[in-house]
From Swiss-Prot:
Protein known as: Insulin-like growth factor 1 receptor
Binding site for ATP: L1005, G1006, Q1007, G1008, S1009, F1010, G1011, M1012, V1013, K1033
Gene, per the UniProt record: IGF1R
Post-translational modification comment from the UniProt entry: Autophosphorylated on tyrosine residues in response to ligand binding. Autophosphorylation occurs in trans, i.e. one subunit of the dimeric receptor phosphorylates tyrosine residues on the other subunit. Autophosphorylation occurs in a sequential manner; Tyr-1165 is predominantly phosphorylated first, followed by phosphorylation of Tyr-1161 and Tyr-1166. While every single phosphorylation increases kinase activity, all three tyrosine residues in the kinase activation loop (Tyr-1165, Tyr-1161 and Tyr-1166) have to be phosphorylated for optimal activity.
Annotated disease: Insulin-like growth factor 1 resistance: A disorder characterized by intrauterine growth retardation, poor postnatal growth and increased plasma IGF1 levels.
Known role: Receptor tyrosine kinase which mediates actions of insulin-like growth factor 1 (IGF1). Binds IGF1 with high affinity and IGF2 and insulin (INS) with a lower affinity. The activated IGF1R is involved in cell growth and survival control. IGF1R is crucial for tumor transformation and survival of malignant cell. Ligand binding activates the receptor kinase, leading to receptor autophosphorylation, and tyrosines phosphorylation of multiple substrates, that function as signaling adapter proteins including, the insulin-receptor substrates (IRS1/2), Shc and 14-3-3 proteins. When present in a hybrid receptor with INSR, binds IGF1. PubMed:12138094 shows that hybrid receptors composed of IGF1R and INSR isoform Long are activated with a high affinity by IGF1, with low affinity by IGF2 and not significantly activated by insulin, and that hybrid receptors composed of IGF1R and INSR isoform Short are activated by IGF1, IGF2 and insulin.
Pfam family, one: PK_Tyr_Ser-Thr
Region feature Disordered, mapped onto this chain: 1288-1367
Length: 1367
């Protein structure tokens, strides 16, 4: 039927449409395919997509039960689907990324039950992988019941859809079991960008090697190219060139002649919601249909199938619409010419129709108060071109629901020239109200029979009104069976044969011969389900028209010698039916009773069939080698249920578990076994244990609220409706198959992959390196119960368990399809223990090689091993990955000092850690005396030369200093301890020297570490600048010679820095007094003061708003860039804080000049044990605990600086004393999230505060994660984007704490023994500078305070700790 609201164009029509479109409209080598592509049962049908660029319609891929290798199928041309994408039960498909690598847009022009992307029951799908999918224009996504599907939590759907609230992602693999890893995260070099989902700021990717594409924020809602260049505003999804409306992958609005346009040009029309076509294109669609079809129309600038509501065609051959005068006439047509109305649903198809082309057959057998519904849907019909037949409509009392019917043309008539036929309507009492009704029957006769409640006078009145009086013969309006509820059947019909199958019954009966054979009209067969043989003819009938019997009319055989019969189909297998037959005759006997015939009630059962699948399969593990499985019987046993077949198969481990190196904490994937309680004899609920009402201890589960119950109920109903809709949409009927086909399908999985073996065999299967091993199925038979226990399984291993139902005909028909469940066994205690002894072999250069056997049956899979070894002092740990162990069979320990050692080894599997092995003892020998003698011969001359050279240099420098008349205000310096000074302590003027007359001081800026800091002007210190505003640092007049030399040495540190984000040294005035250091002027002071000035309550607030998120990120990037430069030049800052960052005139933040601001904020430091001042509130746990300072500890301090920025320079750990802060941080405490702090900024802080230093990002990685948020000028001036930023060799980045000298904070620690960290001797170094001062040297005196804080690398330097004159 084609009506105003429904019906689609034939496939041939669309074929012509898409062929012409492919040749003329789309500017690629591909085609526009459609109107919808349905690929089912055979994976080779995928070839239909080979040349498709756009699918104008939907794409179904479903019901492919045989697992295939899809890697050879790739469709890179496909970029757009205009409607929706549906995937359902496709075996073997693991990712969509290879199939559709360039699918970019799903428009959702028409949806599948409100969804544009549906992925349902895809058992092998491991990831979606549509890494180029950028836009789903309309509709939501539904991803459900995909047992192995991961990488769902790593996709930010808000970047693809406008709204994510209607998305439904349920029943997939739990994220904790997936171990989703975005590209580069395992190597700690993440490549993907981060976004926030449900308050979780994380990397976004589609697979382990494909990031989710995000466009720069500067693009707004525009798409972008692969190189992050913004597309033209009319582009959707992506483009091949920036700002080019001819280079779009898809169009935001409409596509025409190779260009994306906001609206269709003149003389073109919108089509299918995405492109523009001309009038001839619409006309070509018309010509493709049959001649009597009205085809497409053009209305309101759109080419569409029919006029919208309120409009009608302007003539039968017109392509244009005009407004209706009053209700619009609407012509409806049934393709089969006859429309059967047997329910409200079928009547609904006629809603709004005024003219019906064809015949109406009304057959409403049951239903209460159905007339109002029929009137809503059929009340506007005015004309029927064919005939109207009303039969067996026991629910009808009147025909008034056809309230506007005024003309029956009778162009097509029933046999006998009938155009109005009313037969066997048990409750029909009235036709129409003829006082207010004009109905014309233009051609044909009327026929009325077997309407016991319809008065003959009502029929005669209709004759007069309709103009048919005189057309009917005497038998057409039978006065004996209309209006008379009497009937008596005197003859008995006898069945002659019955034949049954699983859903059919064929019956025949004796031919009935009434006295006048002409009065035999037909037969009616009545049948119904009858579990018991106690039904009667009148069961289920009432005055309202309810009737429990199904009725089928059987026409008389044309050959009088053939016995009448009927095929009843659509029956249920293995079901007993009651059947009887009644003859419909007009024969009258003398007492005016109707003469007829009927049979006795016959009981007959259909044949058995394959049962439906078992229901509600559950599995739980009660030990490391057993799984308990429980299920419910099938809803349709289709026979006498006899037994069940239980089959199980070990599942291979996920491939990434073999590929990744898990020697990093917090990155080991989590697996859970199938917990729960299933009792073998009786299934009982395991009561939950929760904390209710604030009281601890086990108690009942807290009751759900009414709102929660209602929400769960609605969700369950919605899920059921969706599944029904899904199954009704994709399961289409096909011709009945032969029985051998049914048997073959039912037994395919049961026989082809089974083998005759016992369950015990599964325990001895080895664990090969083959990632996707196909393990065999094992099976057992379960009789007379719905539960079983599977034994002899491997510990902590995932199994697939299939349950098949089998009835008494299983040998012949086969068993049901399977219902399956995945379950994991419990871990076995001791399974991860290393079974044999640990052995060792000596290796050259103070190394040994440890060997040990692998656990035989581990809990799932061994991921790594951990070695704990050491001598008498402290144990060290070494991690050995699975790959390394498989390659070498053990591990090598290098660079061991001579002595006795013990070592123990522990394995880590998917379930956790095993036990430590018994210790193995080994001895590392010292080098032989001969070797020592050789070394001594080599080293002695070198030492003598160094000593002599040092003495010569000292004498030269001393002589030069002595003759320098301008030293120390013209007075010679007499040292109390002349042996203390070395050549390294004396400052030698160099190219940084500036003449004093070029410096002019103007005003004081503040007090520095050594003296006052002034603002001034320097001439010629910056190239191409005659005069430059500078900061001038001085030394107090009362400063000692040591302090003056230290002042100049600290300035010398700055000579090596040349970075935009580090405050620059411009020159030094060391000749004469006072000594001056010329620095870059930072007019806005230190960052701490600047941030506090932005507080609203500050009186000196320069009317500047608090920094926005983008400004905070800009500050963070500038600080990180300066720190990355220091790190690249082997400097460890050790005192990174807001007070030590400076703010320039243009608000650029730079790393400070390492001394200018420290005395101002001396309260930010803490003196531990009476020694040097320490910035404990900015220090990392390892720095507080072991005195280790590395670039990782600088990253921790950087996180605290971010916290200062977010709080406008509040004091960290406010409310805690310095001692409390020290303990709090060493015990793992962290700063709380500041109020109104953006998630992105706080997530960056948390990354910097990882307790394990190795887990913290480097400064370069920090910049990489926020580089898209930085201002464009950052690229021009930063170290990150400079040529100087070259990645060093891996050896150079090895700043591991274990490779560094770890000495307690006590500066008086003896060189002979290392005291515990909390012991303090209270002694000071006898010679040298005051506590807390660190002079940069080539090597450090062990007794020099805080020398150990420089880190443990010879080529790495540390910046000085803060000074204090009070030390």
């Amino acid at each position: 039927m084609k009506s105003g609201s429904g019906g689609g164009s034939p496939t041939s029509l669309w074929g012509l449409l898409f062929l012409s479109a492919a040749l003329s409209l789309w500017p690629t080598s591909g085609e526009i395919c459609g109107p919808g592509i349905d690929i089912r049962n055979d994976y080779q049908q995928l070839k239909r997509l080979e040349n498709c660029t756009v699918i104008e319609g939907y794409l179904h891929i479903l019901l492919i039960s045989k697992a295939e290798d899809y890697r050879s199928y790739r469709f890179p041309k496909l970029t757009v689907i205009t409607e929706y994408l549906l995937l359902f039960r496709v075996a073997g498909l693991e990712s969509l990324g290879d199939l559709f690598p360039n699918l970019t847009v799903i428009r959702g022009w028409k949806l599948f039950y409100n969804y544009a992307l549906v992925i349902f029951e895809m058992t092998n799908l491991k990831d979606i992988g549509l890494y180029n999918l950028r836009n789903i224009t309309r509709g939501a996504i539904r991803i459900e019941k995909n047992a192995d599907l991961c990488y769902l939590s790593t996709v930010d759907w808000s970047l693809i859809l406008d709204a994510v609230s209607n998305n439904y992602i349920v029943g997939n693999k739990p994220p904790k079991e997936c171990g989703d890893l975005c590209p580069g995260t395992m190597e700690e070099k993440p490549m993907c960008e981060k976004t926030t989902i449900n308050n979780e700021y994380n990397y976004r990717c589609w697979t382990t090697n494909r990031c989710q594409k995000m466009c720069p924020s500067t693009c707004g809602k525009r798409a972008c190219t692969e190189n992050n260049e913004c597309c033209h505003p009319e582009c959707l999804g992506s483009c091949s060139a920036p700002d080019n409306d001819t280079a779009c992958v898809a169009c935001r609005h409409y596509y025409y002649a190779g260009v994306c346009v906001p609206a269709c040009p003149p003389n073109t029309y919108r089509f299918e919601g995405w492109r523009c076509v001309d009038r001839d294109f619409c006309a070509n669609i018309l010509s493709a249909e049959s001649s009597d079809s009205e085809g497409f129309v053009i209305h309101d600038g759109e080419c569409m199938q029919e006029c919208p509501s309120g409009f009608i065609r302007n003539g039968s051959q017109s392509m244009y619409c005009i407004p209706c005068e009053g209700p619009c006439p609407k012509v409806c047509e049934e393709e089969k010419k006859t429309k059967t109305i047997d329910s409200v649903t079928s009547a609904q198809m006629l809603q709004g129709c005024t003219i019906f082309k064809g015949n109406l057959l009304i057959n409403i057998r049951r239903g209460n108060n159905i007339a109002s519904e029929l009137e809503n849907f059929m009340g506007l019909i005015e004309v029927v071109t064919g005939y109207v037949k009303i039969r067996h409509s026991h629910a009808l009392v009147s025909l008034s629901f056809l309230k506007n019917l005024r003309l029956i043309l009778g162009e097509e008539q029933l046999e006998g020239n009938y155009s109005f036929y009313v037969l066997d309507n048990q409750n029909l009492q009235q036709l129409w109200d003829w006082d207010h009704r004009n109905l014309t029957i233009k051609a044909g006769k009327m026929y009325f029979a077997f309407n016991p409640k319809l008065c003959v006078s009502e029929i005669y009145r209709m004759e007069e009104v309709t103009g048919t009086k005189g057309r009917q013969s005497k038998g057409d309006i039978n006065t004996r069976n209309n209006g008379e509820r009497a009937s008596c059947e005197s003859d008995v019909l006898h069945f002659t044969s019955t034949t049954t199958s699983k859903n059919r019954i064929i019956i025949t009966w004796h031919r009935y011969r009434p006295p006048d054979y002409r009065d035999l009209i037909s037969f009616t067969v009545y049948y119904k389900e009858a579990p018991f043989k106690n039904v009667t003819e009148y069961d289920g009938q009432d005055a309202c028209g309810s009737n429990s019997w199904n009725m089928v009319d059987v026409d008389l055989p044309p050959n009088k010698d053939v016995e009448p019969g009927i095929l009843l189909h659509g029956l249920k297998p293995w079901t007993q039916y009651a059947v009887y037959v009644k003859a419909v005759t007009l024969t009258m006997v003398e007492n005016d009773h109707i003469r007829g015939a009927k049979s006795e009630i016959l009981y007959i059962r259909t044949n058995a069939s394959v049962p439906s699948i078992p229901l509600d399969v559950l599995s739980a593990s009660n030990s490391s080698s057993q799984l308990i499985v429980k299920w419910n019987p099938p809803s349709l046993p289709n026979g006498n249920l006899s037994y069940y077949i239980v089959r199980w198969q070990r599942q291979p481990q996920d491939g990434y578990l073999y590929r990744h190196n898990y020697c990093s904490k917090d990155k080991i994937p989590i697996r859970k076994y199938a917990d729960g309680t299933i009792d073998i004899e009786e299934v009982t609920e395991n009561p939950k244990t929760e904390v209710c009402g604030g009281e601890k201890g086990p108690c009942c589960a807290c009751p759900k609220t009414e709102a929660e119950k209602q929400a769960e109920k609605e969700e369950a109903e919605y899920r059921k409706v969706f599944e029904n809709f899904l199954h009704n949409s994709i399961f289409v009927p096909r011709p009945e198959r032969k029985r051998r086909d049914v048997m073959q399908v039912a037994n395919t999985t049961m026989s082809s992959r089974s083998r005759n073996t016992t369950a015990a065999d599964t325990y001895n299967i080895t664990d090969p390196e083959e990632l996707e091993t196909e393990y065999p199925f094992f099976e057992s038979r379960v009789d007379n119960k719905e539960r079983t226990v599977i034994s002899n399984l491997r510990p902590f291993t995932l199994y697939r368990i299939d349950i098949h139902s089998c009835n008494h005909e299983a040998e012949k028909l086969g068993c049901s399809a399977s219902n399956f469940v995945f379950a994991r066994t419990m871990p076995a205690e001791g399974a991860d223990d290393i079974p044999g002894p640990v052995t060792w072999e000596p290796r050259p250069e103070n190394s040994i090689f440890l060997k040990w056997p692998e656990p035989e049956n581990p809990n799932g899979l061994i991921l790594m091993y951990e070695i704990k070894y050491g001598s008498q002092v402290e144990d060290q740990r070494e991690c050995v990955s699975r790959q390394e162990y498989r390659k070498y069979g053990g591990a090598k320990l290098n660079r061991l000092n001579p002595g006795n050692y013990t070592a123990r080894i522990q394995a880590t599997s998917l379930s956790g850690n095993g036990s430590w092995t018994d210790p193995v003892f080994f001895y590392v020998q010292a080098k032989t005396g001969y070797e020592n003698f050789i070394h001594l011969i080599i080293a002695l001359p070198v030492a003598v030369l160094l000593i002599v050279g040092g003495l010569v240099i000292m004498l030269y420098v001393f002589h030069r200093k002595r003759n320098n008349s301008r030293l120390g205000n013209g007075v010679l310096y007499a040292s109390v301890n002349p042996e203390y000074f070395s050549a390294a302590d004396v400052y030698v003027p160099d190219e940084w020297e500036v003449a004093r007359e070029k410096i002019t001081m103007s005003r004081e800026l503040g007090q520095g570490s050594f003296g006052m800091v002034y603002e001034g002007v320097a001439k010629g210190v910056v190239k191409d600048e005659p005069e430059t505003r500078v900061a001038i640092k001085t030394v107090n007049e009362a400063a000692s010679m040591r302090e003056r030399i230290e002042f100049l040495n600290e300035a010398s540190v700055m000579k090596e820095f040349n970075c935009h984000h580090v405050v620059r040294l411009l020159g030094v005035v060391s000749q004469g007094q006072p000594t001056l250091v010329i620095m870059e002027l930072m007019t806005r002071g230190d960052l701490k003061s600047y941030l506090r000035s932005l507080r609203p309550e500050m009186e000196n607030n320069p009317v500047l708003a608090p920094p926005s998120l983008s400004k905070m990120i800009q500050m963070a990037g500038e600080i990180a860039d300066g720190m990355a430069y220091l790190n690249a030049n082997k400097f460890v800052h050790r005192d990174l804080a807001a007070r030590n960052c400076m703010v320039a005139e243009d608000f650029t933040v730079k790393i400070g000049d390492f001394g200018m601001t420290r005395d101002i904020y001396e309260t930010d430091y803490y003196r531990k044990g009476g020694k040097g001042l320490l910035p404990v509130r900015w220090m990392s746990p390892e720095s507080l605990k072991d005195g280790v300072f590395t670039t990782y500890s600088d990253v921790w301090s950087f996180g605290v600086v971010l916290w200062e920025i977010a709080t406008l320079a509040e004091q960290p750990y406010q409310g805690l004393s310095n001692e409390q802060v020290l303990r709090f941080v060493m015990e793992g405490g962290l700063l709380d999230k500041p109020d109104n702090c953006p998630d992105m900024l706080f997530e960056l802080m948390r990354m910097c505060w990882q307790y394990n230093p190795k887990m913290r990002p480097s400064f370069l990685e920090i910049i990489s994660s926020i580089k898209e948020e930085m201002e464009p000028g950052f690229r021009e001036v930063s170290f990150y984007y400079s040529e100087e930023n070259k990645l060093p060799e891996p050896e150079e980045l090895d700043l591991e704490p274990e490779n560094m000298e770890s000495v307690p904070l006590d500066p008086s620690a003896s060189s002979s023994s290392l005291p515990l960290p909390d012991r303090h001797s209270g002694h000071k170094a006898e010679n040298g500078p005051g506590p807390g001062v660190l002079v940069l040297r080539a090597s450090f005196d062990e007794r020099q305070p805080y020398a150990h804080m420089n880190g443990g690398r010879k080529n790495e330097r540390a910046l000085p700790l803060p000074q204090s004159s009070t030390c």
